[in-house]
Amino acid sequence: MSNPAVASEHYINRELSWISFNERVLAQALDTRTPLLEQAKFSAIFSNNLDEFFMVRVASLKAQVEAGITKTSADGLTPLQQLLTIRDHLVPLIEQQQDHYRKHLKNQLVEHGVHLLDYEQLNPKERLWIDNYFQTAIFPVLTPLAVDQAHPFPFVSNLSLNIATLILDPETGQQQFARVKIPQKTIPRFVEIPPDLSGINPKPVHTAVPLEQVVAFNLKLLFPGMKIEEHYFFRVTRDADLELRDLEADDLMSAMEQGLHKRRMGGEVVRLEVTNEMPQRVVEMLIEGMAVEEKDLYRIEGLLGLDDLFGLMRLPLEQLKDQPHIGLTAKVLSRSQRRMLEDESIKEEEFKSIFSVIRRKDILLHHPYELFATSVEEFINQAADDPLVMGIKITLYRTSKDSPIIAALIRAAEHGKQVMALVELKARFDEGNNIQWARHLERSGVHVVYGVLGLKTHTKTILVVRKEKERLRSYVHIGTGNYNSKTSRLYTDLGLLSARPELSQDLVELFNYLTGFSKQQSFRRLLVAPVTLRKGMESLILREIEHAREGRGGHIRAKMNALVDPAIISLLYEASQVGVRIELIIRGMCCLYPGRKGFSENISVISIIGRFLEHSRIFWFANDNNPEVYIGSADLMPRNLDRRVEAITPIEEPEQKEHLERLLNLYLNDNREAWDMQSDGSFLQRQPNPNSEEHRAQQQLINLWQQGIPAA
């Protein structure tokens, strides 16, 4: 079905919707109920998110402006209007973040023995120690760069922290400008000072001073014979988006490496951050030297680059962090549960196999509450070592360093199995890591492919082929999250282990589509982008519309990271207007307006921001009291529906459908970490009534799993 584009007055600008999401992240940092070091972490996430937003989204808009493009977005704004509006929204948020760091976070940390000091606050013993540290550990790696007729303005790399200094030559009386880059990639941003030197009783747990201040107050050693008159800090963000035309690249890996080199060098400057005290005349030197526009200048009252607050999470102050969470092995995969499932006739070696459990029943996994290591990684590990397994195929979008899954794939190849890995080289900001893994896998005998021309492969799928009683049986994993051991502990994701023949055959054909010249146009059970997912999702919504029109009611529940696609939004509006009840749980961007009388009054939207990043996608359709439920890798965005390879699988087991419905209920009833989207597009955080019980979905899920209650 083809839907008309949604009217601009009914569509929220995606960039502003993203800023609203990041504002909710910042709110976690500002919330005094958040443990103190977790506040620092959320502040760091806010900054890191903002860096990527400028490197990709703002860079794209600036490129459009420079190209003279005036075409409006779905909400009716030109690229230039979007840039100006983005700035207006960001400035107060950045001020809130800095205000929180200066006035709250630093002071509260002192109460727990953590002193984040300015250089000028150090006592004489501490200054002596830090100055000696500068000479031995910092000074040798610094390179001061002067700017004059013989020395053009130096290149300033992306996300680098720098000192702009004005120095005076006493002999000539001439003032010169110089730039010093802070070596923050090789030296910690906060330089720790031995607590014994503080003279404070009781002794601090941790005393540190910002690295850039250590350098700034020792500049005289970099410019002997010169007088340091002024110094100021600045930070640069450059265009870091890689857009490669696959058809023009004979060797995609080579093209990616060239693109990564360009990224390291950096594209056009898209943001210049300076400390608030920098005078305009110095700002103008930077603007001229780096060809920056005035509207890209951000004055910051405080430390630049607060993403480095991530480092505070390493402090041994567990009482200032969320309680540690270690997931459990999925009950059906635990050894005691397996023993109950097995027939007495089954041999001991078969009892040990995860495949025997999957054959009996689909397994629905929920991370991080259920361990990734004892489910997905165990699935791959057993496949690698099982002599009956003939082949393994997997899609890799983002994976972790020292990945157990990579190790298992290599081991499988060494055992003589047919192993194929699709490594998506275009996974943004993981391109370099994926290139290294691709080469490592190839050297180990794994067949490595890079996907379909013109598409990014985002699906999370594994296919294992096993020889059983003179026949081949396939086992599959289809998930919502990456095969990444680290993020599996931090993100909420779902996965399905199954041996259903129709799913297995669909995955065989999907991998053929990814690795060969297959032009598969239909699948039995999977919804696959860009082939069947858009049409399938539209059909499911249209069916609810038809039920509502015929008086049978209609109900849609969906959980995702983002809802941006205008055609899907238009259909949801239509569904609301005929009485379909629509409940959406959307962590990030949402471009529809809910709750508008006579238009979208049957649509509600909440966003959950908690200790775990909500990453799972669930699509639930009432279907006249015969629910259909899907999970998978896709959000409802044009890129996911049309420009990526995605896979969404139906959930077939009735108790697993019920489990996902209970899960959605938990999220919808959250009154602590849920934000209600208002009819004007803004969000309000829910607050539990003083006399009511607090419901935090993520904490409730931790508690339920610890009690052994969930059964899927």
Curated annotation (Swiss-Prot):
GO cellular component: polyphosphate kinase complex
Modifications made to the protein after synthesis: An intermediate of this reaction is the autophosphorylated ppk in which a phosphate is covalently linked to a histidine residue through a N-P bond.
Domain of life, source organism: Bacteria
Species: Prochlorococcus marinus (strain MIT 9313)
GO process terms (BP): polyphosphate biosynthetic process
First-tier enzyme category under EC: transferase
Residues reported in the UniProt entry to bind ATP: N49, Y491, R587, H615
HAMAP family: Polyphosphate_kinase (MF_00347)
Entry keywords, A to Z: ATP-binding, Kinase, Magnesium, Metal-binding, Nucleotide-binding, Phosphoprotein, Repeat, Transferase
Reactions catalysed: [phosphate](n) + ATP = [phosphate](n+1) + ADP
Family that this chain belongs to: Belongs to the polyphosphate kinase 1 (PPK1) family.
CDD domains named in the record: PLDc_PaPPK1_C1_like, PLDc_PaPPK1_C2_like
Entry GO MF terms: ATP binding; metal ion binding; polyphosphate kinase activity
Alphabetical list of Gene3D superfamilies matching this protein: Endonuclease Chain A, Polyphosphate kinase middle domain, Polyphosphate kinase N-terminal domain
List of residues binding Mg(2+): R398, R428
Record-annotated active site: H458 (phosphohistidine intermediate)
Protein known as: Polyphosphate kinase
Cofactor list: Mg(2+)
Free-text function comment from the UniProt entry: Catalyzes the reversible transfer of the terminal phosphate of ATP to form a long-chain polyphosphate (polyP).
EC number(s) from the headed UniProt entry: 2.7.4.1
Family matches, as NCBIfam families: poly_P_kin, PRK05443.1-1, PRK05443.1-2, PRK05443.2-2
InterPro entries: PP_kinase, PP_kinase_C_1, PP_kinase_middle, PP_kinase_middle_dom_sf, PPK_C_dom2, PPK_N_dom, PPK_N_dom_sf
